[in-house]
């Protein structure tokens, strides 16, 4: 899991400053970076004082972000954004409810035991079939509206095939392995490809390495911050606690990342 985060997960977010400021040095990256840090700092404060609310915010913004990255349809109006937000939300709820006991341990650690265990387990059993059925209904809706939602109708079949692969993996792997695959590989590669297209770079190895090289300074800073946060607050022998703090670290970086990255889909 750490390897996928290190090689792809963090670097795709580390390019945010270049999305706003450009790959060259004509724009002041320091101002962009300062705004990024201040936004993250405000969210850290929310995690400290209201971890339950911060967790809810994280789930909602992650649903939107995962949905927009996986989405291969049109993005020319709000209706499309609503569809891929709910697809992303269904994915998160399905994944958490499928692995409800593991998720409970992580959420208890994140929220400092503010989670009602019995209620969480009951809701988890409810959300699993609900999220799966909603996802199937959404794809059924998209099937009958392929011309409206996709620039090429065959994209629906590609999107459906991708979802089948992810569903199989979600049902056959532990939560942390699927999370490592989805965030560290699937989501990150798709995100990096969108960034590559944004900067009109080719798909050559040279241009891919160029992107990763650009990401290295801010990747190092992000990893130092996350690791420092982890080692200050949890013992290395506590895997649930470690995973919880990784989630918080990623959550803190997600809000400013979403603010920047959504511009690619406008």
Whereabouts are the PLM-identified features?
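Extracellular/periplasmic helix-loop-helix junctions in multi-pass membrane proteins
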Residues: 228-248
